[in-house]
């Protein structure tokens, strides 16, 4: 019998045809666009050069640490770039007397995105006896000017919170 309303794609099924392993367990459309995008990203990284990326991120990280350490009441967690040159291009930090979520929200209002919370490292937070931290992450596309703007906003935010608490 004919259905009324929206168009039909499926009437009934008499049998099933299964693909061979491993394809029979893969549902839906393969991630073709994602694979093409991944290939383009890999070619771009190869063009820029992984050593150049690592060197640039190391410079940025040293600059970020210097700027954060210059702000009164900011404590950077973990080893400095001088202590661990191969460290990631990020800085996790605390601001005395201010919850990390408040710092992140206020910094966000100025158009700068940082992370706050546990960062999936609750055991480390227990060691430092803190409930949350803030984290500024860098990329090889980051600039010294962006770090300067972030650190100026952070210093301004810390001063504002001290003045109003």
PLM segments and residue spans:
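Conserved N-terminal phosphate-binding loop of PLP-dependent enzymes in the Aspartate aminotransferase
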Residues: 18, 37, 89, 107
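Well-ordered alpha-helical segments within folded domains of soluble proteins
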Residues: 33-43, 91
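Short, conserved charged micro-motifs
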Residues: 98-104, 145-148
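PLP-dependent enzyme catalytic core of the Aspartate aminotransferase-like
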Residues: 39, 109-115, 121-165
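Short, solvent-exposed beta-strand edge segments and adjacent coil->beta transition regions
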Residues: 22, 86-90, 131-135
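A short glycine-threonine-serine/GTX helix/turn-capping micro-motif
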Residues: 12, 16-32
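Single conserved hydrophobic/aromatic residue that forms the stacking wall/gate
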Residues: 1-6, 10
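Conserved small-domain helix->loop->beta segment predominantly found in fold-type I
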Residues: 26, 45-99, 162
């Amino acid at each position: 019998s004919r259905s009324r309303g929206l168009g039909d794609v499926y009437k009934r099924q008499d049998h099933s045809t299964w693909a061979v392993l491993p394809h029979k367990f893969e549902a839906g459309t393969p991630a073709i666009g994602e694979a093409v995008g991944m290939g383009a990203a890999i070619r771009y990284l190869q063009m820029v050069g992984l050593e150049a990326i690592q060197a640039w991120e190391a410079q940025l990280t040293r600059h970020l640490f210097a700027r954060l350490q210059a702000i009164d009441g900011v404590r950077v967690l973990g080893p400095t770039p001088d202590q661990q040159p191969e460290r990631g291009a990020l800085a996790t930090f605390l601001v005395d007397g201010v919850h990390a979520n408040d710092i992140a929200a206020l910094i966000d209002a100025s158009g700068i995105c940082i992370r706050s919370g546990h960062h999936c490292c609750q055991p480390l937070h227990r060691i430092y006896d803190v409930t949350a931290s803030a984290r500024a992450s860098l990329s090889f596309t980051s600039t010294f000017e962006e770090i300067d703007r972030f650190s100026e906003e952070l210093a301004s935010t810390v001063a504002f919170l001290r003045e109003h608490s």
